């Protein structure tokens, strides 16, 4: 925000006696020169004034061609449909843009994919049509109802229908969506998945787990791709024409030739044909933008703007065919390929990877030749940040709000090591940090792959960036990441050198990569890129406290009145018996969800085959096999995601202490207190989702003693082995149990321990818990963050608790800390923040991220969201605009312990 805008807003607020709290003024004042370029600020204003728009153009052309090519080989048929969709996308260039193209013809938005999932649109079809009919009488006043939600269209207005709680769609497009959705009934990945899932003998258990929110959502048709790292190598090294030529040559070599691979060898011919079809569609898409830029040039009267359009024409016409020549061309091509990738499927978390190292060849050579300055590079990176922030993912309201919080997790990793073990940091990565400090947008989020070999000044620069309060970079233990790579992918040939190529996919999913040798103007560079399947498509978010709830309630969900598990009918006379039943229920949940997910993903790979992401990542082009035929180098990537770990740990500690060790209460008394919410209203009734401001209704005091005892029971995060050992035992057990699960590729699975935003809705679906948490309130965030307000012994005690187990044996763990801005003010404060981070990572912690903001600012922003449009917070592995978060997550972030001294 410019100083003039800030002063104007402050004067307005002060006139109304409203406190003017801007994000982290204590720390921003240290870096008051960190302002985005005028061009970037103008485009950010466009973004802030743009609503998320759902558009039917891409699906219309996809569906039309798909029908037309009925009878063709499935992978080729899908390629032709994608080609038609890309070829017919309407170009839209915003004045001032130097990086162009987007998901749809709208600056911000996405589109539905009924071939993947259509049930929501069919079920809501009549309602949406009725909504569209009555909209003509709506007044413009209704616009203000969702103004506090940033770009989210939470309510219908004017000529616009709200869809999935986030997107607006023009009413004339609604009938097209409903008609198309009905065409896919019984044929979508979702419907076919349900059809075959029902053949499982324990299908009812799976449905019960979903209905009660023990499991958050199915991944096979909801978000089948993503939470992985893209690979830009082939377009960057060969150009799009080069890929087509490779595919044509390979087609000749494999036609009719099984080459000892059996029947799967015959699939290579069809895959290479599909690659050609899709690339041709992408080329048409790019060239359509070039034509549009040429048209804009022809009508532009300003000479400077005219030259900019001319430059765009030259860039787009070149990258549509050839290897990029300059840094700007390489940046444009990688962005274009990224959009192509996320348009192929329902995707969140298609992460960018080691971007500063990938684009370094062009940066180095352009700087040496004097073709570009550092300031020009920074501006381009600012513009890139805005374009990535514009990416939206179309999903159901439950997924968009309950998991993604509107974020798409396009994480960019910096630091780490090169193939030879030397530092991966370079000058371009420093400029990426600088651009992130000047142009503070939620996307792309940055992750520092911390290693002891990284230069001190580079780490200090990253700490300065974190201090500004954007929540990034998050800090990840590079040593832990490479150790996990070696463990999980040993059977697929992972080496130490290749393990160093990993990066973060999605918000916090450790994702395998590989090194490729790129040649630019005769000089060879080794660059990293993704080489694995989705690292987040598996069992999606088991609610740990909810499993414990059902143990106590004999397998029954009292909120929904559903008998989820078979009654165990055990008296739970001992703590060991509670643990035994918990493990049994947990294993049942993993088993049935894993098998259902395998069916969904198997149908997805057959009918919604990935072609763009397949051709990008090694070794699909070499093998002639797409993702679904394990063309990728690494395929043991599917996981079991969990939520609410610390709430569960604290609950076990309370049960053990109060019921079994001290015998202060019986198990029946505990169950009664839980069913009656310790005498309080449910959080959903109150409208507050943290433990603050809950309303007591019991006037007898019946539950006062047990409630106080539960709150006072041992809690994780205080270096107290009573609670911490419960976490340790759980983690050791969970890792083994997940390895027993098997993905559709017959590969072992592993734990993924992040909450994203699921701790909100899953907490809402859970009764009170034995730790004193009340019904409907949000779970603990992350996996090793303390439950809000329960870490009483300082941050270093929390670190001791978190590192009681070996965090390198699983995909991730998640630690969130909230620091008051004054705690890390000044240069010494920056050093203090870096030392704090080092302390945790050196102890074996995998991940740590910070919110540097005071709680009073957040409370005021909750009341006056329009005054804080630019305020961002770190949630759980991602950064998002405060005004676009749901209230349950806002309440949880406010409630987190705020450290004023470290």
From Swiss-Prot:
Domain PFL: 38-774
Residues reported to bind 4-hydroxyphenylacetate: 348, 507, 540, 641
A Pfam family this chain is assigned to: Gly_radical
Single GO MF descriptor: 4-hydroxyphenylacetate decarboxylase activity
Gene Ontology cellular-component annotations: cytosol
PROSITE patterns: GLY_RADICAL_2 (PS51149), PFL (PS51554)
Reaction(s) the record says it catalyses: 4-hydroxyphenylacetate + H(+) = 4-methylphenol + CO2; 3,4-dihydroxyphenylacetate + H(+) = 4-methylcatechol + CO2
Keywords, sorted A to Z: Lyase, Organic radical, Phosphoprotein
Enzyme class, UniProt record, top EC level: lyase
Enzyme active site: 507, 509
Modified residues (Glycine radical): 877
NCBIfam families listed in its UniProt record: glycyl_HPDL_Lrg
Protein purpose: Glycyl radical subunit of the HPA decarboxylase that decarboxylates phenylacetates with a hydroxyl group in the p-position. Active toward 4-hydroxyphenylacetate and 3,4-dihydroxyphenylacetate, forming 4-methylphenol and 4-methylcatechol, respectively. Is likely involved in the catabolism of aromatic amino acids such as tyrosine fermentation. 4-methylphenol (p-cresol) formation provides metabolic toxicity, which allows an active suppression of other microbes and may provide growth advantages for the producers in highly competitive environments.
Subunit structure: Heterooctamer consisting of 4 large (HpdB) subunits and 4 small (HpdC) subunits, arranged as a tetramer of heterodimers. Also forms a catalytically inactive homodimer.
Descriptive protein name: 4-hydroxyphenylacetate decarboxylase glycyl radical subunit
Native source organism of the sequence: Clostridioides difficile (strain CD196)
Gene: hpdB
């Amino acid at each position: 925000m410019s100083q003039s805008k800030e002063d104007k807003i402050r004067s307005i607020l002060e006139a109304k006696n409203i406190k003017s709290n801007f994000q982290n003024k204590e720390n921003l004042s240290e870096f008051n020169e960190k302002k985005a370029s005028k061009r970037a600020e103008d485009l950010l204003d466009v973004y802030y004034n743009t609503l998320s728009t759902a558009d039917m153009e891409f699906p219309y052309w996809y569906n039309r061609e798909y029908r037309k090519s009925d009878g063709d080989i499935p992978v080729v048929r899908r390629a032709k449909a994608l080609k038609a969709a890309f070829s017919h996308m309407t170009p839209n260039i915003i004045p001032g843009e130097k990086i162009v193209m987007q998901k749809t013809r709208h600056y911000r938005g996405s589109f539905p994919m009924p071939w993947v999932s259509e049930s929501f649109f069919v079920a809501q079809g009549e309602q949406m049509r009725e909504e569209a009919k009555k909209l003509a009488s709506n007044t413009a006043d209704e616009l203000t109802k969702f103004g506090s939600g940033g770009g989210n269209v939470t309510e219908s207005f004017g000529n616009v229908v709200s869809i999935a709680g986030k997107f607006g769609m023009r009413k004339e497009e609604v009938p097209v969506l409903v008609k198309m959705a009905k065409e896919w009934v019984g044929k979508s990945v979702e419907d076919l998945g349900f059809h075959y899932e029902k053949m499982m003998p324990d299908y009812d258990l799976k449905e019960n787990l979903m209905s009660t929110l023990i499991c958050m959502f199915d991944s096979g048709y909801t978000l089948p791709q993503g939470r992985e790292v893209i690979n830009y190598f082939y377009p960057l090294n060969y150009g799009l024409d080069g890929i087509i030529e490779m595919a044509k040559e390979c087609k000749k070599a494999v036609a009719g030739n099984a080459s000892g691979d059996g029947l799967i060898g015959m699939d290579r011919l069809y895959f290479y044909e599909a690659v050609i079809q899709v690339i041709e569609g992408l080329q048409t898409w790019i060239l359509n933008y070039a034509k549009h830029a040429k048209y804009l040039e022809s009508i532009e009267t300003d000479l400077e703007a005219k030259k900019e359009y001319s430059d765009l024409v030259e860039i787009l016409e070149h990258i549509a065919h050839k290897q990029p020549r300059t840094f700007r061309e390489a940046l444009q091509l990688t962005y274009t390929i990224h959009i192509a990738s996320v348009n192929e499927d329902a995707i969140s978390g298609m992460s960018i990877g080691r971007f500063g190292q990938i684009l370094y060849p062009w940066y180095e050579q352009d700087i040496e030749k004097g073709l570009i300055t550092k300031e020009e590079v920074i501006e381009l990176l600012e513009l890139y940040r805005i374009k990535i922030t514009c990416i939206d993912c179309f999903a159901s309201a439950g997924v968009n709000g309950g998991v993604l919080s509107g974020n798409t997790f396009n994480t960019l990793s910096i630091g780490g090591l090169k193939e030879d073990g030397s530092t991966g940091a370079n000058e371009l990565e420093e400029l990426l940090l600088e651009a992130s400090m000047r142009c503070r947008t939620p996307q792309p989020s940055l992750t520092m792959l911390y290693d002891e070999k990284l230069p001190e000044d580079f780490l200090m620069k990253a700490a300065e960036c974190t201090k500004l309060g954007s929540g990034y970079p998050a800090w990840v233990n590079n040593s832990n990441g490479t150790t996990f790579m070696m463990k999980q992918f040993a059977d697929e040939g992972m080496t130490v050198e290749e393990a160093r190529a990993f990066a973060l996919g999605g918000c916090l999913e450790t994702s395998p990569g590989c090194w490729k040798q790129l040649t630019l103007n005769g000089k060879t560079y080794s660059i990293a890129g993704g080489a694995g399947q989705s690292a987040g498509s598996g069992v999606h978010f088991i609610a740990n406290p909810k499993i414990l709830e059902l143990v106590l309630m004999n397998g029954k969900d009292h909120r929904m009145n559903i008998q989820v598990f078979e009654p165990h009918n055990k008296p739970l006379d001992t703590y060991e018996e509670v643990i035994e039943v918990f493990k049994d229920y947990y294993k049942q949940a993993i088993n049935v969800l894993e098998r259902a997910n395998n069916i969904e993903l198997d149908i997805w790979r057959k009918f919604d085959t990935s072609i763009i992401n397949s051709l990008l990542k090694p070794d699909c082009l070499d093998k002639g096999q797409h993702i679904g035929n394990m063309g990728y180098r690494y395929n043991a990537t599917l996981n079991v995601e969990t939520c609410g770990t610390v709430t569960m740990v604290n609950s076990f500690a309370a049960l053990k202490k109060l019921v079994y060790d001290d015998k202060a209460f019986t198990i029946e008394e505990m169950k009664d207190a839980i069913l009656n919410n310790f005498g309080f209203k449910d959080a959903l009734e109150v409208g507050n989702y943290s433990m603050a401001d809950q309303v007591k209704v019991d006037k007898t005091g019946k539950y006062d003693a047990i409630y106080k005892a539960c709150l006072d029971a041992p809690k994780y995060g205080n270096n107290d082995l009573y609670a911490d050992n419960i976490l340790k035992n759980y983690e050791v057990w969970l890792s083994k149990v997940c390895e027993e699960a098997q993905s559709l590729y017959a590969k072992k699975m592993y734990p993924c321990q992040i909450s994203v935003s699921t701790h909100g809705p899953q907490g809402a679906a859970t009764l009170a818990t034995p730790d004193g948490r009340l019904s409907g309130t949000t779970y603990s965030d992350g996996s090793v963050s303390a439950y809000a307000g329960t870490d009483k012994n300082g941050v270093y005690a929390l670190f001791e608790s978190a590192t009681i187990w070996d965090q390198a044996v699983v995909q991730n763990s998640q630690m969130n800390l909230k620091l008051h801005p004054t705690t890390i003010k000044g240069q010494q404060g920056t050093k203090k923040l870096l030392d704090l981070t080092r302390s945790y990572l050196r102890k074996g912690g995998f991940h740590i991220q910070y919110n540097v903001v005071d709680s009073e600012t957040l409370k005021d922003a909750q009341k006056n969201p329009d005054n804080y449009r630019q305020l961002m917070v770190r949630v759980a592995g991602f950064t998002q605009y405060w005004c676009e978060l749901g209230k349950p997550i806002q309440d949880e972030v406010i409630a987190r312990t705020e450290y004023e001294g470290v």
